[in-house]
C-alpha cells in the first residue's frame, strides 16, 4: 500500500474489549514478534498480559460493505508497574500498513494519552534500535541502552505534556487477561526475574 493510500484510510484506536478483538490482537502479535521477527519461538504472551490493557488500531469498514469486520492495523499494550509509573510494549503494525507510519503514530498517541488520562506521571518503553528515531520524532527521550532477546534497545521515556489524555474508561483487566492466560503455560511465559517492566518490543 502506498503512503498516500494509507493516509486516506480512516483509522481509529481503542482498547480491545471483546474476545474477538483480543484474539485478533494476540494473533497479530504472534505474526509480528514470532513468525516475522523471531523474537519468540511460537508465542509472545507473558505474565504482563494479565495486567496490561490491550489497544488496537482498526481500519474503518468500506462504505460499500459497512457490515464487514474492521481490519486490524496494529497493536500495543500498556500497564502500570507502580502507582503513576506506566510502561508500553508489544507495539506492532501489520505489514500492509507500514508505509506512512500513520498506524504506529496513532497507537503511541493513544497508548500514552490513555495512560496519562489514568494518572501516569511517567511512561517508558524499551524500543528496538531501528525505531528509536521514530520515537524521538514523537517527543520521546532515550534514557539508557540495553540488550533484550539478543537485540539492542533504547530505554525511552515519553514527554507526557506532549500527549493529549484520551477519554478511555479504566476497567479491571478481564477478557484480555483470560485470552492471554490460555497461552502463558509454556514458551510464552517469562520468569519473575525478567518481569522488570522492560518489554522486548
Regions found by a protein language model. Give the residues of each.
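Terminal substrate-recognition subdomain of acyl/acetyltransferases
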Residues: 1-14, 65, 116-117, 129-201
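Short alpha-helical
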Residues: 20, 83, 129-133
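Active-site rim helix/loop that mediates acceptor-substrate recognition in acyltransferases
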Residues: 30-67
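Short acidic/glycine-enriched loop/turn segments that link adjacent beta-strands
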Residues: 51, 84, 149-153
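Short, high-confidence coil segments that cap the C-terminus of an alpha-helix
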Residues: 52, 118-120
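Conserved beta-strand in the GNAT
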Residues: 56, 65-80, 84-92
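Conserved hydrophobic beta-strand within the GNAT/NAT acetyltransferase core sheet
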Residues: 88, 123-127
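Conserved acetyl-CoA-binding loop-helix of GNAT-fold acetyltransferases
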Residues: 93, 99-113
Amino acid at each position: 500500500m502506498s503512503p498516500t493510500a494509507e493516509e486516506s484510510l480512516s483509522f481509529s484506536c481503542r482498547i480491545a474489549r471483546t474476545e474477538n478483538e483480543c484474539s485478533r490482537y494476540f494473533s497479530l502479535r504472534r505474526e509480528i514478534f514470532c513468525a516475522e521477527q523471531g523474537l519468540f519461538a511460537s508465542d509472545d504472551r507473558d505474565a504482563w498480559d494479565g495486567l496490561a490493557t490491550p489497544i488496537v488500531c482498526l481500519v474503518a469498514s468500506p462504505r460499500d460493505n459497512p457490515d464487514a469486520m474492521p481490519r486490524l492495523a496494529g497493536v500495543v499494550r500498556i500497564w502500570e508497574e507502580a502507582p503513576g509509573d506506566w510502561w508500553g510494549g508489544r507495539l506492532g503494525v501489520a505489514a500492509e500498513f507500514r508505509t506512512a507510519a500513520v498506524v504506529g503514530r496513532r497507537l503511541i498517541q493513544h497508548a500514552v494519552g490513555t495512560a496519562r488520562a489514568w494518572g501516569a506521571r511517567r511512561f517508558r518503553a524499551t524500543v528496538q534500535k531501528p525505531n528509536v528515531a521514530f520515537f524521538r520524532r514523537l517527543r520521546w527521550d532515550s534514557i539508557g541502552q540495553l540488550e533484550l532477546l539478543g537485540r539492542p534497545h533504547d530505554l525511552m521515556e515519553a514527554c507526557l505534556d506532549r500527549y493529549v489524555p484520551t477519554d478511555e474508561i479504566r476497567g479491571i483487566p478481564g477478557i484480555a487477561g483470560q485470552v492471554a492466560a490460555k497461552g502463558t503455560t509454556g514458551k510464552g511465559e517469562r520468569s519473575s526475574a525478567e518481569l522488570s517492566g522492560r518489554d522486548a518490543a
